[in-house]
């Protein structure tokens, strides 16, 4: 059982996931500070110096901090955008699957063309076909 666990943990996917979670945790604090200390004040500057985190609604003793929710949405959008950019950059350097499939499809098409040419040559040249049949008979 210990050996199986070691194999499971040693697989690339598990290690990649662990690294992703650790880096994601560290990245979250960077994005939060970016949003809280740069983006929100910048947005507040354009809409009259309003800080979203101060927006609250109090109803019958309950406090709804929808400004904090707006900050969370901004955090999410920034993280999603940065991940999108990172994926685009990584995909730029990886070979495209479509190109590989196109190359394989082209090779198959070329093979079919050659086979059709051979077939047509045999059909149009009965002498060649009979020579091939004679060679087959002599090897038996």
From Swiss-Prot:
UniProt name for this protein: Large-conductance mechanosensitive channel
Q: What does this protein do?
A: Channel that opens in response to stretch forces in the membrane lipid bilayer. May participate in the regulation of osmotic pressure changes within the cell.
Question: TM spans, by residue?
Answer: 14-34, 37-57, 66-86
State the membrane topology: Multi-pass membrane protein
Q: Where in the cell is it found?
A: Cell membrane
Is Nuclease set as a keyword in this record?
A: no
Q: Which GO terms describe its cellular component?
A: plasma membrane
Q: Does Ion transport count among this protein's keywords? A: yes
InterPro entries linked to this entry: Mechanosensitive_channel_CS (IPR019823), MS_channel (IPR001185), MSC/AndL (IPR037673), MscL_channel (IPR036019)
Which family is annotated? Belongs to the MscL family.
Sorted keywords for this record are: Cell membrane, Ion channel, Ion transport, Membrane, Transmembrane, Transmembrane helix, Transport
Gene that this sequence comes from: mscL
Q: What is its quaternary makeup? A: Homopentamer.
Mind telling me which NCBIfam families this protein's record contains? Answer: mscL, PRK00567.1-3
**Molecular-function annotations in GO:** mechanosensitive monoatomic ion channel activity
């Amino acid at each position: 059982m210990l050996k199986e666990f070691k194999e499971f943990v040693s697989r690339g996917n598990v290690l990649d996931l662990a690294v992703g979670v650790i880096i994601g945790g560290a990245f979250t604090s960077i994005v939060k500070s970016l949003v809280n200390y740069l983006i929100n004040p910048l947005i507040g500057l354009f809409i009259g110096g309003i800080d979203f985190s101060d927006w609250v609604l109090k109803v019958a003793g309950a406090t709804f901090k929808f400004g904090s929710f707006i900050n969370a949405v901004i955090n999410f959008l920034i993280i999603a955008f940065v991940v999108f950019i990172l994926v685009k950059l990584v995909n730029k350097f990886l070979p495209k699957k479509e190109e590989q499939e196109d190359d394989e499809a082209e090779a198959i098409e070329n093979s079919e063309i050659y086979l059709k040419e051979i077939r047509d040559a045999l059909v149009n040249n009965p002498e060649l076909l009979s020579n091939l049949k004679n060679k087959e008979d002599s090897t038996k």
